[in-house]
């Protein structure tokens, strides 16, 4: 008996796989690719990256077979894939300006976008969210990126009766950071 509340269970009930595209094929996308062979109802239609050869290597190094990689459409420009039947775009360039331009094009084409681009989210997230509402699509942060993890911690704390006073991003750990104060923190950046 399958529990219906799990997203994976809901996904498995679909007749056709969700067609997705990645924009940027670096570390985060490679982590997804490492799990791709276990996902029956998600199909990678396209990968956009400025270095197509490296993107293909990342696919192979993440465990995709040569046969699967050959079926993926690779491009170095988002404009070349906008006419394809892609349901969800994952923007993972890490560049706030480029990421915002990509997300804007995707949203205006009436398709969903997942930002794995905290840089674009913190600089233009409100704009992109409003634009998505206007176009009746979803612009979401990716689970596993810093903003979504912070929100998860806030929700957990509130659900357990804690009053949230403050929440923020942790940074790379270094022993000297342990004794940082609001007055000394800026010296670390």
Predicted regions and their residues:
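N-terminal Rossmann-like dinucleotide-binding module
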Residues: 1-62
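Beta-loop-alpha module in the N-terminal Rossmann-like domain of NAD(P)-dependent dehydrogenases
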Residues: 75-108, 119-125
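A short hydrophobic/small-residue beta-strand
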Residues: 112-114
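Rossmann-fold NAD(P)-binding glycine/threonine-rich loop
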Residues: 98-105, 117-137, 143-145, 152-156
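Short, ordered loop/turn segments at secondary-structure junctions
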Residues: 50-52, 94, 118-121, 143-145, ...
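Conserved anion/nucleotide-ligand pocket segment
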Residues: 152-189
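Conserved N-terminal Rossmann-fold NAD(P) cofactor-binding segment
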Residues: 51-84
